[in-house]
């Protein structure tokens, strides 16, 4: 061995001292969650830092700190996201899978990641935990919140038709429009299915600024997220000036973390109760606060299913047989660099009785010119760059892979 060779030199100045070092068997797989310790075994990131005192407490040495994450699911999602970086030439990606009933996070992946066995000082922002610390304008993901709030206040019903919807709306010095032409008359349900900006902002005007602000506060979208990690982001503060209600209604001019957005989707899916996301098992749960009614939750879940199943929907590639996927897409510009897209898809499944919510996001994905999509038995190419053609596609592949594992682990899900 190298030690024996050095010892054989007979140099008195060579001394061997034993030392302890933490070795992580999964290297990159849980890098943003587990985090790192430094050479003195002090936690410097992730769970290692958040629970540094507990992990060093000799009285707790025999008490394991057990996480909610599933290694098999984490591996599969990590693999699909890495493939997505190549397929869509994206600069980054992220995903989080959460149990909608209790907030347990089964998987959390942020790319690029790093080998936590290498004690590097990772200051480059590309290694930021995109799910918990990344702060973004998430775009049309917010349209679900707008429709849910309007339904909950009995201002509209899913089949309420908004007539003579204009092609564009002038608000102060801005002109707001849709990316394509829609019929002049659309039901509330169709507005969400087709993802109409104009239709959504007209619904928001019925709600009003005060009620919308209260919803955002109740949904914890305007404050630092709660999670057992040091790496959390602060949504950028803003003033409710002219046009803010209109733009916030479809997810522009407001920032939040993906973790917060997926937590609100969990509440909408689970019957309307807010939950606290967590990565540590058997944590004392906070009392759930009602965000929307069960009736509203049921209505939204049905609409989100149609976003996936109807020809007009924006998430058709997520219609994986047997899993009753519902969800909403979001295609937005990076608020720091308007030349880059952020494409997001938040899915719930099974939508008839939701158990899980999955967020998939891709940073600056490009058109996959050589990719052949399998859509309703047809092989097609689509030279398009919206979330429906990348983030949705990736989410569908993930659900197809992890679905059997979740079905095995959850008997109730298996019989849906």
What is each stretch, according to the model?
Residues 382, 400-416:
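Gram-negative outer-membrane assembly/targeting C-terminal domains
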Residues 77, 191, 395:
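A helicase ATPase "motif cassette" and its flanking acidic/Ser/Thr-rich regulatory loops
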Residues 1-62, 359-360, 369-373, 378, ...:
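Small/polar-residue-rich segments within soluble enzyme cores
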Residues 55-93, 101:
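Conserved, well-ordered alpha-helix/loop/beta-strand core segments that scaffold catalytic motifs
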Residues 80-88, 113, 154, 308, ...:
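Structural motif corresponding to the C-terminal cap of alpha-helices
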Residues 32, 39-50, 91-109, 212:
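Carboxylate/His-rich catalytic cores and anion/metal-binding grooves
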Residues 34, 38, 52, 56, ...:
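Amphipathic, well-packed alpha-helical segments that form the structural scaffold of globular domains
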Residues 95, 99-140, 145-378, 382, ...:
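Beta-lactam-recognizing serine transpeptidase/beta-lactamase-like catalytic domain environment
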